[in-house]
């Protein structure tokens, strides 16, 4: 599981 941040207040969880 990792969390990628694309910008302020924006994140994508990849399980």
From Swiss-Prot:
One of the GO BP terms on file: adaptive immune response
Keyword Membrane assigned: yes
Gene Ontology cellular component list: T cell receptor complex
Main location: membrane
Domain of life: Eukaryota
Subcellular location: Cell membrane
UniProt keyword list: Adaptive immunity, Cell membrane, Immunity, Membrane, Receptor, T cell receptor
Keyword Membrane found: yes
Job description of the protein: J region of the variable domain of T cell receptor (TR) beta chain that participates in the antigen recognition. Alpha-beta T cell receptors are antigen specific receptors which are essential to the immune response and are present on the cell surface of T lymphocytes. Recognize peptide-major histocompatibility (MH) (pMH) complexes that are displayed by antigen presenting cells (APC), a prerequisite for efficient T cell adaptive immunity against pathogens.
Subunit comment: Alpha-beta TR is a heterodimer composed of an alpha and beta chain; disulfide-linked. The alpha-beta TR is associated with the transmembrane signaling CD3 coreceptor proteins to form the TR-CD3 (TcR or TCR). The assembly of alpha-beta TR heterodimers with CD3 occurs in the endoplasmic reticulum where a single alpha-beta TR heterodimer associates with one CD3D-CD3E heterodimer, one CD3G-CD3E heterodimer and one CD247 homodimer forming a stable octameric structure. CD3D-CD3E and CD3G-CD3E heterodimers preferentially associate with TR alpha and TR beta chains, respectively.
Protein name: T cell receptor beta joining 2-5
Organism: Homo sapiens
Recorded name of the encoding gene: TRBJ2-5
């Amino acid at each position: 599981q990792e969390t990628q941040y694309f910008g302020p207040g924006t994140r994508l969880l990849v399980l």
